[in-house]
Amino acid sequence: MNTQKKSNKVIQLVAFGSTWEQAYDTFDKVVDDYKAQFSGWDVYLSFSSAICINNARAGENVDPKDYYDPEHWLTAIGLAGYQQIVVQSLQVIPGEEYRRVRDSYVKDFMNNRNGDFSDKYMKSLDRQVVVGTPLMAEESDAKALAQTLNNEADVKAAVAEGIVTFMGHGNPEGYDYYGGNIRYLQLESYLRELNPNYYVGTVDMDQTYAEDVVEHIKGGKFNFAVGDMMYTMNYDVNLSKKGQLYPLMSIAGDHAHNDMADEDLLYSA
């Protein structure tokens, strides 16, 4: 890493990962965007999924590529002597992957679990290590994202002609550690304030699967149980004949290709 180091400040991006070439291209663009936005900072990308790391290395769907987990990168960052460290999650909502980043990788680094760093260096990092939250960490983030999505030219054109559905990932039951699933409902609510043709579904959050979105389009009152919270949404019957699907994920990887784009699945119906 010392050969790559240009600054004493570093941003470590953490994504779940992927095994799709288009996703790798997007990750490269994300890294470039961060470098452009935060000049004077070094920027690196890590994958938190061992499966994605191993499959990328084996060349599944693409030429072999080397990616490393956050522990590998944080160790290298510490050994390189960086003085300001930002670990930025690329997740959409807080869930299992974000919890692992914050409560495992970063915590182990700050506790010098493996004894890789001197006490002097660790003391120098006091208040100099920051963990960036996911895209929709707070409800206000969902509101801001709704406005941003609605301002996208292709989305604005599509929703003016018919249904627009965003497909997120969601936390499966038992893994919604921070109540992050509620953000999808809040996002949908804010989007529908802008245009009732908007819908939000997921691949893993109960009551927001593809078949649930179809029922929402048919209209009715729906109660969502999210942890200890109840959330109610009212939908009018939508008779639109056109529809457009968009992935609500940091990259278009396996879910976008095999869940959303599969003609045999409801998300593509």
Language-model region placement:
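Active-site-proximal alpha-helix that buttresses catalytic centers in soluble enzyme cores
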Residues: 1-269
